[in-house]
Amino acid sequence: MTKNRSRPARRAVGSRQRPAFPRPKKKPRPEEKAPAPKALSYGAIGMEAEFTVLLDRQPVKPEDVFKSPTNIVRAPMMHRTGRSYHLPTGGAVYFDTGVIEIATPMIEIDKGCAARAGRSLWENILYLRRELDAWEQQHGHDVELSGFSTHYNVSFNKSDRQSSASCTVGKLALLLTHILPTPVMLLASNRRSTGIGVRPRGNRVEVTADFTPDASLMIATATLCVGIIKNVMRWPTYELDELARWRRDLPVIRGFTPVPHSSRKGWSAKYTCYPTNPFLADIDDALWETTGGERLSLREMAGRITKFFWPTIQRFSDPFTLRLIGSVMRGRAPSLLELADRPPEYDSVGRLCQWDDLFPEKVLPRSRYERVLGHAIKGERLTMDREAYTPVGMQGWGHVVFRRDRDRSRHVLSLDYLLDHLDEWDSGAT
């Protein structure tokens, strides 16, 4: 996710240069006419999923087999940045050091935002699966997607906090590594999981966990992460000492110390950080001595943490997901950690596990960011100030590159700026 800019983008490289001779003053460009609207108050979220590839049951690197996503997807794709492309369904796809990664667009944080993000992710997964089905028929090989990881991203706007050494995104990530792992374990992990990570990514916080082949549990995990992270972001300090105020409400296992994240800077609550592997233990056994002097089960700890943040989780959750989170924490709905082993659905994503349209658009409309991006990816013209602009590319997730039809000049507009023109785009896109 790219940080939303509060000011319109400057003139892009490659635009027409001003002639040397005098000429009448030009009409201001759309992005120069007025400042972009203020970023949405709650920020944005996004989700990513990584998959390893099995070719005829053997693990392979996707870049070695397919070279580029453009050799899988038959429809034209808008280039995003680097080696990533936008799928017609709105997400981005790219190869990342031996895995295929699919990322959702930015989705503004609001009620039901995690359900929107989960829906977007699974729609893109199933689209890619269908394209791989066609590739199989053409090339005579079997291709399976094996779930590897899921990343839950929540934006962090530095301008929302006073400049303070105790309120950096790095300290926020470390603090969250002491809060998030146990409830995320119950919702997203399996018997072969090895850890839960939290990484500071400049303008966002990223929670990393195993891929979850159950869309409902994945959305529940995203909802819980949004509710907890947005609440903790409002704390007066991100120092670990703040946890001492809530030793019973926010139980931490005694002796727990996170380790550096394996892939990028950040922290991981790895199984080796605990006296016993929590991913293999019975989640209802009171095995864990906490810093508050109690002995609790994994489910009890996860339930207390969830209860503490329940008002914020409820604020951003849809009703179905809220009931599911509560049911898992109370033991009324199963956790994947209660199974003997990792389910086989992990190794055949898009076939053994699919998206059942849990949230149709009539029930949960697309977010405004999704609608803007959808128009852009389809190349639908936008008319502003009697000028027609055609989207031709993206700069990260936050900006759309347009070509003005009259003179083919290049213009870069932020998604926040384009929100002011969404109604015209919805009604007059061509």
Where are these regions (language model features)?
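Terminal catalytic/cofactor-binding subdomain
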Residues: 5, 10-11, 16-137, 146-148, ...
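Short regulatory "switch" loops immediately downstream of catalytic or recognition motifs
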Residues: 57, 157-160
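Inter-helical turn/loop segments and adjacent helix faces that build the functional surface
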Residues: 139, 159-165, 236-239
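Histidine-centered divalent-metal-coordination microenvironment in nucleic-acid enzymes
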Residues: 142-158
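Acidic, His- and aromatic-enriched active-site or binding-groove loops in soluble protein domains
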Residues: 166-184
